[in-house]
């Protein structure tokens, strides 16, 4: 009798943890963005800011998928995490609506690259018969990071301040590398 292959390797768990940290990083700032943007004098741009981030994330996925196939999964995952790390650290330094829009563009791009490369890498390291199960497991970590991130962000903003919350968001992205 053949032993069934497990998807639960160290590499798989590290990818799940990385995706959790990455998703918590970019989602923890979401509830604080409207007030922060308003403090920069850009309350009327809140809808555009959210749309720009989401649109950039979506549009960058096909390109990041091709890039992932061309140069490899790990470099693209690292690129997405590094861009997210830099963006998180720059938010407290931005003092204009235009700068904020540009930053949200790049931050959105990072969320189109990292998860795409991570999903491809999971498919590479998991036996074909277990890929659906593995993608489901990865999805749980992704959804958990995205759902707990805003709670963490609001808590940090309340207890430590917005600047510190942005820096901790940046730290989460760094740890996701």
Feature map (PLM): residue ranges:
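Cytoplasmic helix-loop-helix junction between adjacent transmembrane helices
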Residues: 105-142
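Paired small-residue
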Residues: 98-106
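Helix-breaking motifs and short loop linkers at transmembrane-helix boundaries and internal kinks
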Residues: 72, 93-98
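Helix-loop boundary and gating motifs at the non-cytosolic
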Residues: 8-48
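Residue-level signature of mid-helix packing/kink "hotspots" within the transmembrane helices
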Residues: 54-62, 146-147
């Amino acid at each position: 009798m053949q032993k069934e292959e497990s998807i639960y390797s160290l590499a798989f768990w590290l990818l799940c943890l990385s995706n959790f940290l990455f998703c918590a990083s970019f989602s923890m700032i979401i509830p604080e963005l409207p007030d922060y943007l308003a403090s920069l004098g850009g309350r009327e741009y809140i809808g555009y800011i959210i749309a720009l981030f989401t649109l950039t994330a979506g549009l960058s996925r096909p390109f990041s998928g091709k890039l992932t196939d061309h140069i490899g999964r790990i470099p693209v995952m690292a690129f997405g995490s590094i861009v997210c790390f830099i963006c998180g650290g720059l938010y407290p330094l931005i003092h204009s609506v235009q700068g904020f829009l540009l930053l949200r563009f790049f931050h959105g791009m990072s969320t189109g690259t990292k998860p795409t490369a991570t999903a491809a890498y999971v498919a590479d390291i998991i036996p074909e018969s277990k890929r659906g199960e593995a993608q489901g497991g990865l999805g749980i970590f992704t959804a958990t990071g995205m759902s707990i991130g805003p709670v963490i962000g609001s808590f940090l903003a309340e207890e430590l301040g917005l600047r510190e919350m942005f820096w901790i968001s940046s730290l989460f992205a760094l740890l996701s590398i």
